[in-house]
């Protein structure tokens, strides 16, 4: 693999990780699911969830996000190890929000990823979420209402 190809692959994988967060924050469920290979796997062991394939992933992310009054996720760069048309990596995540039932969640986690090069670009073959810290202290803040954000 050429140095230029390796640089391009790293940039594309980093963009994929950014698209994941953006699709979630913008509630674009079709785009979110399209970031996985057709048989991609999304694991969240802390809530006993393992999803296989784009249809399952799309349905569950929409269901899960429906539980939140508001939700914020930020992702920080991690590692990427390239191996031809596949790669592995980690991304570091901070999430917080309040559920519709009034409980709150703040966590710091690591995504353990496997990536695959496809005709449509790099996609997640597997994404496994490992929570490293969790805090359920009630959040005092709030999210602006949608009408207010539109101003």
What are these regions (language model features)?
Residues 64-151:
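A beta-strand edge to alpha-helix "cap/lid" segment located at domain peripheries
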Residues 29-93:
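A solvent-exposed, acidic/Ser-Thr-rich amphipathic alpha-helical stretch
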Residues 1-34, 38:
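Short, low-complexity N-terminal intrinsically disordered segments enriched in polar/charged residues
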Residues 3, 7, 48-51, 102:
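Charge-dense, low-complexity intrinsically disordered segments
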Residues 9, 13, 53, 107:
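Hydrophobic (often cysteine-bearing) scaffold residues that line and stabilize catalytic clefts
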């Amino acid at each position: 693999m050429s140095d230029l190809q390796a640089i391009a692959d790293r940039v594309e994988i980093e963009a994929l990780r950014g698209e994941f967060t953006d699709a979630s924050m913008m509630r674009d469920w079709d785009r979110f699911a399209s970031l996985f290979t057709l048989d991609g796997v999304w694991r969240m062991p802390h809530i006993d969830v393992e999803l296989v394939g784009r249809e399952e992933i799309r349905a569950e992310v929409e269901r899960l996000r429906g539980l939140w009054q508001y939700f914020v996720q930020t992702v920080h760069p991690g590692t990427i190890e390239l191996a031809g048309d596949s790669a592995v990596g980690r991304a570091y995540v901070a999430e917080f929000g309040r559920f519709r039932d009034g409980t709150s969640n703040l966590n710091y986690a690591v995504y353990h990823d496997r990536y695959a090069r496809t005709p449509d670009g790099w996609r997640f073959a597997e994404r496994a979420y490992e929570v490293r810290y969790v805090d359920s202290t009630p959040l005092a803040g709030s999210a602006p209402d949608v009408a207010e954000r539109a101003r």
